[in-house]
Amino acid sequence: MPPPQIKQDLNRSGWESTDFPSVCENCLPDNPYVQMLKEDYGAECKICTRPFTIFRWKADRTARTKRTTICLTCARLKNCCQCCMLDLSFGLPIVVRDAALKMVAPGPESSINREYYAQEHEKEIQEGRGAVEAYEKTDEKARELLRRLANSEPYYRKPRQQLEGPSDDSTEAQPTDAPVVQSRYGNGPGPIRTSESRRGTPLPGRGRGNMRGGRAGRPFPGTAQIPPSPEDYLPPADPNIMSLFVTGVEDDLPEHTLRTFFTQFGQLRSLICSHRAHCAFINFATREGAEAAAQHCKGKAVIQGCPLRVRWGKPKPLDNMDREERMKNAREGRLTVQAQKDGESGQRAITAAGEPATEKPQSFVVAPPPGSGDVQYSSLSGD
C-alpha cells in the first residue's frame, strides 16, 4: 500500500512567484540596465495579505532604495504601480481614480476572504475578463476628467522640471516685448529665500521685532542685505591671490551647484565648502578666471534662491615679513642675550673687588655610633 500523500495547501499554491515587477516609468531610473534584488515571499501584500516576491532597486547611487509594496495580482487588479501605487494610465492615486470612475466597491475584510478574493480575480485576469473589462466600460466623461487632472501641473513639480531641463528653443520663442524679471538681490534667477521667509516673520533681517535696544526694536540687517563694498570685487594688488571667499551657504545648498556656477568663469583648482561654517572657498586655476567671477558677481550672487556674499580671499601666510624686518628682529634677539651675559659678569666682578667670598662648609648630620642606643644598667653588670 503506497504511503499517504500530503494534502496540497491551496493557499500556499496561490502565493506569488514572479521574475519581473509591474512598475511605472517614474519609479525606474533612466538607465535601462537596472540592478534589482529579488526576494521570494519576502513580505505580505498590503491589500490581499498574501506573501509575494519583493524587488528592491535604486534609481541613483545617492537615492534611497525602492521596493514593491503590493503583489502583482493586486497591481493588475487595481491597474497601478507596485511601488508608488499610482494609476498606470493617468498617474493619479487610485482613490481619486476610483472616485471619478465610480468604481468604489466594498471589499472583503478578513484575511481569508482577501486571499480568496485575490485568487479568484487572478484567474479572471489570466482569462482576460473581470477587472480588465470594468475599466473599459467606464464613462468617457469621467475618463476625460481624469485626463485633465493628470495634465494639470501644480505650482512646483520637481520631477517634470528635471526631465525637461533648460532648452534654448523655449528661450528664443519668447516675445521681445515681454517684461524681463530680474532678481531684486543680484545675479541668479528665482525668488530669494531668507530666514524670515522660512519662519514667516514679516520684518526683514535676522533680529526679532519685539526686542528693544539701540535700534528701537528694529532688527539688525543680515549679511546678505548689506551692500557690498568695492574692495569685495576689485582685484587685489597681490597677483598670487586667485581664490574667492563665499559666505551665506545654507545647509541644503549642495556643493555641486557652487561648482557649476563658478566653473563658467574659468577652471577651478579646488573648492572647499563647509556647511557647518556656512562658507566656501573657490580656488581658481588662473587669475583671469577669479577676476571674471568677481567682476560678474560684484560682491553678491544668488544660487537656487540662496543669497551669497562673494569677496576676494585674504590669505594669511606664516612668514609675511620682508628680509630687513627679519634681520632687525634677529639683531634685537642677539643684543638681548648679550646684555644678559654682561649683567652676570658684572655681578661676579663686584664680588671679587670687595671682601673675599668665603665658602661656608656644608653642614652634615653625623650619624650616631653603633650601640649607642643600648642602655647599661647596674643590675645587669653583676656588681
From Swiss-Prot:
Residues 148-228, 330-383 are annotated as: Disordered. It comes from the Eukaryota. GO terms for cellular component: post-mRNA release spliceosomal complex; Prp19 complex; U2-type catalytic step 1 spliceosome; U2-type catalytic step 2 spliceosome. This is Pre-mRNA-splicing factor slt11. One of its GO terms (biological process) is mRNA processing. Residues 242-315 form the RRM domain. Involved in pre-mRNA splicing. Facilitates the cooperative formation of U2/U6 helix II in association with stem II in the spliceosome. Binds to RNA. Keywords: mRNA processing, mRNA splicing, Nucleus, RNA-binding, Spliceosome. It comes from Aspergillus fumigatus (strain ATCC MYA-4609 / CBS 101355 / FGSC A1100 / Af293) (Neosartorya fumigata). Gene3D superfamilies: 3.30.70.330. GO terms for molecular function: pre-mRNA binding; U6 snRNA binding. The gene is slt11. It is found in: Nucleus. InterPro entries: Cwc2/Slt11, Nucleotide-bd_a/b_plait_sf, RBD_domain_sf, RRM_dom, Slt11_RRM, STL11/RBM22-like_N. Belongs to the SLT11 family.
